[in-house]
Amino acid sequence: MAFVLSLLMALVLVSYGPGRSLGCYLSEDHMLGARENLRLLARMNRLSPHPCLQDRKDFGLPQEMVEGNQLQKDQAISVLHEMLQQCFNLFYTEHSSAAWNTTLLEQLCTGLQQQLEDLDACLGPVMGEKDSDMGRMGPILTVKKYFQGIHVYLKEKEYSDCAWEIIRVEMMRALSSSTTLQKRLRKMGGDLNSL
């Protein structure tokens, strides 16, 4: 019986391989997905930016927080997940569907959802650490405040084409910053549980 159990455990571990760790691993496929999401956002461009310049706004992207080295492992994973979740929520709306090419929008939402699923393996163990909950909340609240400002802006501009174009460019900045964070996490051994 012990031999059969050992054999089954070995098969499970082998089947996961280096790209499908039981822990928290951002594979090369995850990074390719992040780059593809940026390309999709670039392809969603429908307007020349010139008529929309007067609608520009500084939304206060917490770029230093995301791209810098100030986040600890649990904070970085939580911030990355929150940014992707908020971006998904932004584009997975009725207003967004009316503004963009449906095929590109669906591909973007699918890509964001896949990245979120990849990160869920990382977020589970982190969320169980009660003593660091307060340390994660500050950065997460900063991300939520950033996206709340974006939602308010869209509503104030009545979801105009120019407003969506400004947001598309802003989301390219945000996803580019989150990609930088993902690369930093991956360089630290690839396995986020080892950070």
UniProtKB/Swiss-Prot annotation:
Residues 1-23 form the signal peptide. One of its GO terms (molecular function) is hormone activity. Pfam families: Interferon. GO terms for cellular component: extracellular space. Keywords: Antiviral defense, Cytokine, Disulfide bond, Glycoprotein, Hormone, Pregnancy, Secreted, Signal. The keyword Secreted applies. Glycans are attached at residue 101. InterPro entries: 4_helix_cytokine-like_core (IPR009079), Interferon_alpha/beta/delta (IPR000471). Disulfide bonds join 24-122, 52-162. It is found in: Secreted. GO terms for biological process: adaptive immune response; B cell activation involved in immune response; defense response to virus; female pregnancy; humoral immune response; natural killer cell activation involved in immune response; positive regulation of biosynthetic process; response to exogenous dsRNA. IFN-tau genes are intronless. They evolved from IFN-omega genes in the ruminantia suborder and have continued to duplicate independently in different lineages of the ruminantia. They code for proteins very similar in sequence but with different biological potency and pattern of expression. Belongs to the alpha/beta interferon family. IFN-alphaII subfamily. Paracrine hormone primarily responsible for maternal recognition of pregnancy. Interacts with endometrial receptors, probably type I interferon receptors, and blocks estrogen receptor expression, preventing the estrogen-induced increase in oxytocin receptor expression in the endometrium. This results in the suppression of the pulsatile endometrial release of the luteolytic hormone prostaglandin F2-alpha, hindering the regression of the corpus luteum (luteolysis) and therefore a return to ovarian cyclicity. This is Interferon tau-1.
